[in-house]
Amino acid sequence: MKYRSLTEEIKLLELGLPPQEEDGFIGGNLDPKEASLILIPVPWEATVSFGEGTSKAPDNIRLASHQLDVENYHYIKPYKAGISMLEVDKHILKLSNKTRKKALRVIEAIECGESCKKDLKYVNEVSKTINSHVYEAALKRIKKDKFVAVVGGDHSCPLGLIKALDDTSKEDFGILHVDAHHDLREAYEGFTYSHASIFYNVLNECKNVSKLIQVGIRDYSKEEAQRMVNLGDKGDCLYDTAMQAQIATGKSLEEVFTPYIEQLPKNVYISIDIDGLEPLNCPNTGTPVPGGLRYGELEHLIFMVVKSGRKIIGFDLVEVGDSKNGWDANVGARVLYNLCGALLASQGKIEYR
């Protein structure tokens, strides 16, 4: 890929010309050295437990973003701060496909009341390797004073980034997690780094995470619900049914979301599983669930973090599905650009309104 300088990038994006197919996110090809925000694509989905296809999401989102206009209502010209999406690592995609086949054998064995120890060991070892890869990629950029985000892939993908932030942060930080699921299972289906275990692992491996706020949850196990209760002051959850009930009685989004935003510390990491949205906006995500946030509700929730004065230190977008008409990637690209704007605005890199 031939990179552009930030000056060249801004000039080209403001011309509004159709991007070339090989161009990066929003049609950019910014040299990562000049970017404020680095997007790390992670085409990984070995442990998904229902629908497949999210390993294709990073590239699908890149392509779908080519038809986005770069202006944004809340966030003033995010592209001017410099956003660079790294190229998809084809080796990881190939490894994901290979590991997925072994994971399926493990899942099928469980369903038959059997075990498949050799394949399970392989999946867990490779998953650990992926976590290390993401950790090193993120740490390298963080040490160069870049902001970093992950574009998955399944929800196991951002663990390496969160751990890199945990290891480099001088202060505690909270996590705002939007999802249909708690993702608090311990080694779901035997996979230590399952997509359904991301926040179990985060809470056990990251010492500086002081708060976990979850929004949109509507499909969960007894184990997970109890684990959330056991977090005490360290966690809180706005279940989707409770959220919808408040909205139905006439409460504004500000009234509904504020008690949860106020619990977050000044530094916030945002994790967005696209299935936190209503299925209209993510029909091909791996585990869709009826209900969920409307697109505008998610947009407002994120903006409330920014206008509260909190600083977004990183984020991830995961579980975007694959579809022939490109709708899932289209929505994913818009959520991603919104997250980029929110982080940059919260960090004073751009203005917001």
Language-model segments: which ranges?
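Conserved alpha-helical scaffold segments that buttress catalytic/binding sites
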Residues: K2-R353
